Amino acid sequence: MSLTINKMLNIKGRTCLITGACGKVGQALSLALSEMGCNLILLDHPKTNLKELKNQISKKFKNEIILIPCDLESSREIDEVNLSIEKNFNSLDILINNAAFVGSSNLKGWATSLENQSLDTWRRAIEVNLTASFKLIQNTKKFLEKSSHASIINIGSIYGIYGPDLSIYENTNMNNPAAYSVSKAGLLQLTRWMSTVLAPKIRVNSISPGGIFRNQPEEFVKRYIHKTPLKRMGSESDVVGAAVYLSTDLSSWVTGQNIIVDGGWGVW
Protein backbone atom coordinates (compact mmCIF):
# COMPACT_ATOMS: atom_id res chain seq x y z
CA MET A 1 0.00 0.00 0.00
CA SER A 2 1.34 3.43 -0.90
CA LEU A 3 2.29 5.88 1.82
CA THR A 4 0.03 8.81 2.59
CA ILE A 5 1.35 12.33 2.07
CA ASN A 6 1.61 12.81 5.83
CA LYS A 7 3.73 9.69 6.18
CA MET A 8 5.99 10.74 3.31
CA LEU A 9 6.47 14.12 4.97
CA ASN A 10 7.22 12.62 8.38
CA ILE A 11 10.94 12.87 9.16
CA LYS A 12 10.58 13.16 12.93
CA GLY A 13 13.56 11.65 14.71
CA ARG A 14 15.88 11.71 11.72
CA THR A 15 19.30 13.31 12.06
CA CYS A 16 20.40 16.13 9.79
CA LEU A 17 23.84 17.75 9.43
CA ILE A 18 23.73 21.30 8.05
CA THR A 19 26.91 23.18 7.14
CA GLY A 20 26.96 26.96 7.09
CA ALA A 21 24.21 26.79 9.69
CA CYS A 22 24.62 30.37 10.91
CA GLY A 23 24.12 31.96 7.50
CA LYS A 24 20.73 33.26 6.40
CA VAL A 25 19.84 30.13 4.42
CA GLY A 26 21.47 27.88 7.02
CA GLN A 27 19.36 29.34 9.81
CA ALA A 28 16.18 28.94 7.78
CA LEU A 29 17.05 25.32 7.02
CA SER A 30 17.86 24.64 10.67
CA LEU A 31 14.55 26.05 11.88
CA ALA A 32 12.56 24.21 9.22
CA LEU A 33 14.14 20.82 9.86
CA SER A 34 13.69 21.38 13.60
CA GLU A 35 10.02 22.14 13.06
CA MET A 36 9.73 18.82 11.23
CA GLY A 37 11.21 16.99 14.20
CA CYS A 38 14.76 16.33 13.06
CA ASN A 39 17.70 16.15 15.41
CA LEU A 40 20.34 18.59 14.20
CA ILE A 41 24.09 18.70 13.83
CA LEU A 42 24.86 22.34 13.14
CA LEU A 43 28.25 23.14 11.65
CA ASP A 44 29.81 26.51 10.95
CA HIS A 45 33.07 28.43 11.27
CA PRO A 46 34.41 28.80 14.85
CA LYS A 47 33.95 32.59 14.61
CA THR A 48 30.18 32.28 14.10
CA ASN A 49 27.66 32.19 16.94
CA LEU A 50 26.37 28.63 16.86
CA LYS A 51 25.25 28.81 20.50
CA GLU A 52 22.92 31.71 19.74
CA LEU A 53 21.37 29.73 16.88
CA LYS A 54 20.89 26.72 19.15
CA ASN A 55 19.19 28.90 21.77
CA GLN A 56 16.91 30.39 19.12
CA ILE A 57 15.84 26.93 17.95
CA SER A 58 15.51 25.48 21.46
CA LYS A 59 13.00 28.18 22.42
CA LYS A 60 10.64 26.80 19.79
CA PHE A 61 11.43 23.09 19.46
CA LYS A 62 12.61 20.24 21.69
CA ASN A 63 14.79 18.26 19.30
CA GLU A 64 18.40 17.37 20.07
CA ILE A 65 21.00 19.81 18.71
CA ILE A 66 24.74 19.23 18.48
CA LEU A 67 27.12 22.08 17.56
CA ILE A 68 30.32 21.61 15.58
CA PRO A 69 32.59 24.65 15.14
CA CYS A 70 34.62 23.75 12.06
CA ASP A 71 36.84 25.58 9.60
CA LEU A 72 36.03 23.94 6.27
CA GLU A 73 39.40 25.02 4.90
CA SER A 74 40.97 22.54 7.34
CA SER A 75 40.92 18.88 6.31
CA ARG A 76 41.83 17.92 9.87
CA GLU A 77 38.81 19.73 11.31
CA ILE A 78 36.51 18.13 8.73
CA ASP A 79 37.84 14.70 9.75
CA GLU A 80 36.92 15.48 13.37
CA VAL A 81 33.25 15.92 12.41
CA ASN A 82 32.92 12.14 12.34
CA LEU A 83 33.89 11.95 16.00
CA SER A 84 30.95 14.16 16.96
CA ILE A 85 28.51 12.15 14.84
CA GLU A 86 29.80 8.88 16.28
CA LYS A 87 29.64 10.13 19.86
CA ASN A 88 26.15 11.62 19.68
CA PHE A 89 24.12 9.71 17.08
CA ASN A 90 26.30 7.15 15.26
CA SER A 91 24.07 7.56 12.21
CA LEU A 92 23.00 10.26 9.78
CA ASP A 93 19.92 10.61 7.59
CA ILE A 94 20.35 13.97 5.87
CA LEU A 95 23.47 15.94 4.91
CA ILE A 96 22.98 19.49 3.62
CA ASN A 97 26.15 21.01 2.16
CA ASN A 98 25.17 24.66 2.44
CA ALA A 99 28.38 26.42 3.54
CA ALA A 100 30.02 28.63 0.93
CA PHE A 101 31.74 31.87 0.19
CA VAL A 102 29.03 33.84 -1.61
CA GLY A 103 29.05 36.94 -3.77
CA SER A 104 28.73 39.25 -0.76
CA SER A 105 31.47 37.57 1.30
CA ASN A 106 34.07 40.05 2.55
CA LEU A 107 37.18 38.57 0.93
CA LYS A 108 40.20 40.25 -0.62
CA GLY A 109 40.12 40.11 -4.41
CA TRP A 110 36.65 38.53 -4.50
CA ALA A 111 33.65 40.55 -5.69
CA THR A 112 35.64 42.77 -8.01
CA SER A 113 36.60 43.06 -11.67
CA LEU A 114 38.17 40.05 -13.39
CA GLU A 115 41.57 41.74 -13.40
CA ASN A 116 41.50 42.19 -9.63
CA GLN A 117 40.19 38.77 -8.58
CA SER A 118 42.75 37.07 -6.35
CA LEU A 119 44.14 33.61 -7.09
CA ASP A 120 44.52 32.95 -3.36
CA THR A 121 40.85 33.76 -2.81
CA TRP A 122 39.95 31.60 -5.83
CA ARG A 123 41.70 28.66 -4.14
CA ARG A 124 39.96 29.34 -0.81
CA ALA A 125 36.56 29.41 -2.52
CA ILE A 126 37.17 26.11 -4.30
CA GLU A 127 38.25 24.62 -0.96
CA VAL A 128 35.15 25.75 0.97
CA ASN A 129 32.49 25.65 -1.75
CA LEU A 130 33.50 22.38 -3.39
CA THR A 131 36.31 20.38 -1.78
CA ALA A 132 34.78 20.52 1.71
CA SER A 133 31.51 19.08 0.38
CA PHE A 134 33.39 16.22 -1.27
CA LYS A 135 35.29 15.54 1.95
CA LEU A 136 32.16 15.61 4.11
CA ILE A 137 30.33 13.22 1.80
CA GLN A 138 33.35 10.94 1.76
CA ASN A 139 33.61 10.97 5.56
CA THR A 140 29.90 10.65 6.42
CA LYS A 141 29.12 7.92 3.88
CA LYS A 142 29.44 5.21 6.54
CA PHE A 143 26.82 6.93 8.73
CA LEU A 144 24.42 7.70 5.88
CA GLU A 145 24.53 4.06 4.76
CA LYS A 146 22.98 3.07 8.10
CA SER A 147 19.84 5.04 7.23
CA SER A 148 17.00 3.70 5.10
CA HIS A 149 16.15 7.28 4.06
CA ALA A 150 19.59 8.79 3.37
CA SER A 151 19.59 12.06 1.44
CA ILE A 152 22.42 14.43 0.54
CA ILE A 153 21.47 17.94 -0.57
CA ASN A 154 24.08 20.23 -2.09
CA ILE A 155 23.22 23.93 -2.26
CA GLY A 156 24.36 25.17 -5.65
CA SER A 157 23.50 28.36 -7.53
CA ILE A 158 22.10 29.52 -10.84
CA TYR A 159 25.64 30.81 -11.46
CA GLY A 160 26.82 27.22 -11.51
CA ILE A 161 24.64 26.91 -14.64
CA TYR A 162 24.50 30.35 -16.29
CA GLY A 163 26.98 33.09 -16.99
CA PRO A 164 26.46 36.41 -15.18
CA ASP A 165 24.86 39.47 -16.70
CA LEU A 166 27.27 42.09 -15.40
CA SER A 167 24.96 44.93 -16.45
CA ILE A 168 22.79 44.34 -13.37
CA TYR A 169 25.79 45.23 -11.17
CA GLU A 170 26.62 48.54 -12.88
CA ASN A 171 27.12 51.50 -10.51
CA THR A 172 26.89 49.28 -7.42
CA ASN A 173 29.58 47.91 -5.13
CA MET A 174 28.59 44.38 -6.17
CA ASN A 175 30.12 41.94 -8.63
CA ASN A 176 30.08 38.25 -9.60
CA PRO A 177 33.25 36.32 -8.63
CA ALA A 178 34.46 33.71 -11.13
CA ALA A 179 35.40 31.28 -8.36
CA TYR A 180 31.85 31.33 -7.01
CA SER A 181 30.40 30.27 -10.35
CA VAL A 182 33.08 27.67 -11.04
CA SER A 183 32.87 26.12 -7.57
CA LYS A 184 29.08 25.88 -7.78
CA ALA A 185 29.29 24.31 -11.24
CA GLY A 186 31.68 21.76 -9.79
CA LEU A 187 29.24 21.07 -6.96
CA LEU A 188 26.48 20.30 -9.45
CA GLN A 189 28.69 17.79 -11.25
CA LEU A 190 29.75 16.32 -7.89
CA THR A 191 26.03 15.82 -7.22
CA ARG A 192 25.57 13.85 -10.44
CA TRP A 193 28.75 11.82 -9.86
CA MET A 194 27.84 10.97 -6.26
CA SER A 195 24.25 10.09 -7.18
CA THR A 196 25.38 7.08 -9.21
CA VAL A 197 28.30 6.09 -6.99
CA LEU A 198 26.27 6.16 -3.75
CA ALA A 199 23.11 4.59 -5.18
CA PRO A 200 20.98 2.78 -4.21
CA LYS A 201 21.53 3.46 -0.49
CA ILE A 202 21.96 7.24 -0.62
CA ARG A 203 20.14 9.81 -2.75
CA VAL A 204 22.11 12.89 -3.84
CA ASN A 205 20.50 16.03 -5.26
CA SER A 206 21.18 19.75 -5.47
CA ILE A 207 19.25 23.00 -5.23
CA SER A 208 20.31 26.00 -7.30
CA PRO A 209 18.77 29.20 -5.96
CA GLY A 210 18.65 32.45 -7.84
CA GLY A 211 19.31 35.80 -6.20
CA ILE A 212 18.00 36.09 -2.65
CA PHE A 213 16.94 39.51 -1.43
CA ARG A 214 19.42 40.88 1.12
CA ASN A 215 18.80 44.63 1.01
CA GLN A 216 20.91 45.01 -2.09
CA PRO A 217 21.09 48.43 -3.79
CA GLU A 218 17.70 49.49 -5.14
CA GLU A 219 18.95 49.75 -8.72
CA PHE A 220 20.30 46.19 -8.61
CA VAL A 221 17.00 44.86 -7.23
CA LYS A 222 15.02 46.61 -9.97
CA ARG A 223 17.26 45.16 -12.69
CA TYR A 224 17.13 41.69 -11.17
CA ILE A 225 13.34 41.69 -10.88
CA HIS A 226 13.02 42.96 -14.45
CA LYS A 227 14.89 39.83 -15.64
CA THR A 228 12.80 37.46 -13.47
CA PRO A 229 9.40 36.22 -14.76
CA LEU A 230 7.92 35.94 -11.24
CA LYS A 231 8.93 39.58 -10.63
CA ARG A 232 10.62 39.26 -7.27
CA MET A 233 13.92 38.17 -5.78
CA GLY A 234 14.08 34.94 -3.84
CA SER A 235 13.82 34.37 -0.10
CA GLU A 236 15.24 31.81 2.28
CA SER A 237 11.80 30.18 2.40
CA ASP A 238 12.03 29.40 -1.31
CA VAL A 239 15.18 27.36 -0.68
CA VAL A 240 13.65 25.70 2.37
CA GLY A 241 10.68 24.43 0.35
CA ALA A 242 12.94 22.56 -2.05
CA ALA A 243 15.14 21.28 0.78
CA VAL A 244 12.16 19.88 2.70
CA TYR A 245 11.02 18.05 -0.43
CA LEU A 246 14.47 16.48 -0.91
CA SER A 247 14.76 15.63 2.80
CA THR A 248 11.51 13.68 2.94
CA ASP A 249 10.17 10.54 1.31
CA LEU A 250 8.24 12.73 -1.13
CA SER A 251 11.45 12.53 -3.17
CA SER A 252 12.31 8.89 -2.46
CA TRP A 253 12.72 8.13 -6.19
CA VAL A 254 14.62 11.31 -7.02
CA THR A 255 18.40 11.35 -7.28
CA GLY A 256 21.03 13.10 -9.37
CA GLN A 257 18.73 16.07 -9.95
CA ASN A 258 19.22 19.81 -9.66
CA ILE A 259 16.18 21.81 -8.58
CA ILE A 260 16.46 25.35 -9.93
CA VAL A 261 14.68 27.81 -7.62
CA ASP A 262 15.05 31.09 -9.48
CA GLY A 263 11.63 32.57 -10.22
CA GLY A 264 12.09 31.68 -13.87
CA TRP A 265 15.38 33.58 -14.35
CA GLY A 266 16.78 30.88 -16.63
CA VAL A 267 13.81 30.31 -18.95
CA TRP A 268 14.03 33.43 -21.10
Regions found by a protein language model. Give the residues of each.
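Conserved glycine-rich Rossmann-like NAD(P)H-binding loop of the short-chain dehydrogenase/reductase
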Residues: 38-52
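Conserved NAD(P)H cofactor-binding loop of Rossmann-fold oxidoreductase domains
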Residues: 98-110, 264
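Conserved glycine-rich cofactor-binding loop
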Residues: 22-24
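Active-site Tyr-X3-Lys motif and surrounding loop/helix of classical short-chain dehydrogenase/reductase
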Residues: 80-87, 106-127, 223
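Short, small/polar-rich loop/turn modules that mediate ligand/substrate recognition or access, typified
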Residues: 149, 199-203, 254-256
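Short C-terminal tail/terminal secondary-structure segment
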Residues: 2-7, 164-167, 171, 244, ...
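Catalytic loop of short-chain dehydrogenase/reductase
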Residues: 115, 119-121, 145, 153-199, ...
